[in-house]
């Protein structure tokens, strides 16, 4: 009988991650059941995680320090586990973005089935450049030809994945007001009902545009979705915000006001309005909206 060949590290990575395939499952329902950590819910996430786990495999296979520590080139994923911190430090040293490093840590945590205790860089809001001003890619999206799409995004705040899957059946009218029901392509599979915001004319245009969508919508790669979501967040916040002067001096002041820190130190928001904007966007954290969406309010 011939010797059974041991799978390569890349084959082990592929097999392990494929065993977690949960395409079509509801992450929202799994989260409520406490089992969301067992699955990978989208093809794009699977592809991204496998790609970056392979970068880790390349690192350990090519590292003289790893070979010296083991006495041989690593053969199994378990042998590689100890060198995850060294890989993360190496990636940070290469100057990779905080987002990329954290994503690689998440990919490796999924591969090994545990939350890794790693020292990761913190996101600095001031370093974020994307969607914070005019970019070359914006020139590829005609404002004239896409005026209805742009108006819709400003009025409704969909994510790119949500916009691709919206259809006419997602329009809701409650007490005379238009809403969008987001149930497909949402982050974590969590559904939400978001008000359509804008002037009466803009709202009607957005509602009509939604009726033209089919659930299989092409979204231009150059569309700056985050910036449009920021405009939507500002609209929701402004509608819900109370006068800060009316909240000061009360016993509820600390609970009613959100005071920013870091580079936005001193800026104060109405906490209740922040939560309204956060939920309309599909988040549930006031700090996310204050730090990453209301920059147009500064």
Where do the protein language model's features map onto the residues?
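Alpha-helix N-cap/helix-start motif at helix boundaries, enriched for small hydrophobics
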Residues: 46, 161-166, 277
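Basic, Lys/Arg- and aromatic-enriched nucleic-acid-binding interface segment
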Residues: 131-160, 261, 268-274
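C-terminal catalytic core of Y-nucleophile DNA break-rejoin enzymes
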Residues: 186-232
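Short basic/aromatic active-site micro-motif
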Residues: 220-274, 283, 288
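Conserved tyrosine-mediated DNA breakage-rejoining catalytic core shared by Y-recombinases
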Residues: 132, 165-203
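N-terminal DNA-binding module of tyrosine recombinases/phage integrases
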Residues: 1-39
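Non-catalytic DNA-binding core/recognition domains of DNA-processing enzymes
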Residues: 37-115
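Flexible interdomain linker/hinge and immediately adjacent N-terminus
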Residues: 4, 85, 89, 93, ...
């Amino acid at each position: 009988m011939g010797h059974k060949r041991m799978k390569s590290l890349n084959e082990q990575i592929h097999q392990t991650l494929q065993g977690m395939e949960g395409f079509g499952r509801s992450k929202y329902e799994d989260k409520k059941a406490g089992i969301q950590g067992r699955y990978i819910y989208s093809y794009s996430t699977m592809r991204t995680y496998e790609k970056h786990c392979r970068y880790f495999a390349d690192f350990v296979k090519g590292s003289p320090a790893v070979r010296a520590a083991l006495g041989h080139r690593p053969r199994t994923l378990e042998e590689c586990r100890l060198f995850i911190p060294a890989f993360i430090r190496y990636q940070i040293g290469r100057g990779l973005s905080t987002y990329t490093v954290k994503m690689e840590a998440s990919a490796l945590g999924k591969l090994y089935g545990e939350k890794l205790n790693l020292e990761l860089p913190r996101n600095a809001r001031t370093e974020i450049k994307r969607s914070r001003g005019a970019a070359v890619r914006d020139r590829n999206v005609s404002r004239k030809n896409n005026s209805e799409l742009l108006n819709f995004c400003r009025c409704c705040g969909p994510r790119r994945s949500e916009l691709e899957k919206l259809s006419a059946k997602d329009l809701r009218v409650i007490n005379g007001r238009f809403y969008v029901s987001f149930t497909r392509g949402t982050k974590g599979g969590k559904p939400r009902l978001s008000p359509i915001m804008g002037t009466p004319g803009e709202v009607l245009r957005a509602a009509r545009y939604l009726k033209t969508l089919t659930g299989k919508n092409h979204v231009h790669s150059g569309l700056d979705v985050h910036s449009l979501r920021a405009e939507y967040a500002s609209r929701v916040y402004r509608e819900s915000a109370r006068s800060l002067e009316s909240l000061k001096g009360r016993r509820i002041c600390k609970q009613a006001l959100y005071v920013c820190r870091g580079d936005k130190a001193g800026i104060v928001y109405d906490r209740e309005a922040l939560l309204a904007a956060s939920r309309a966007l599909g988040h549930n954290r006031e700090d996310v909206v204050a730090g990453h969406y209301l920059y147009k309010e500064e």
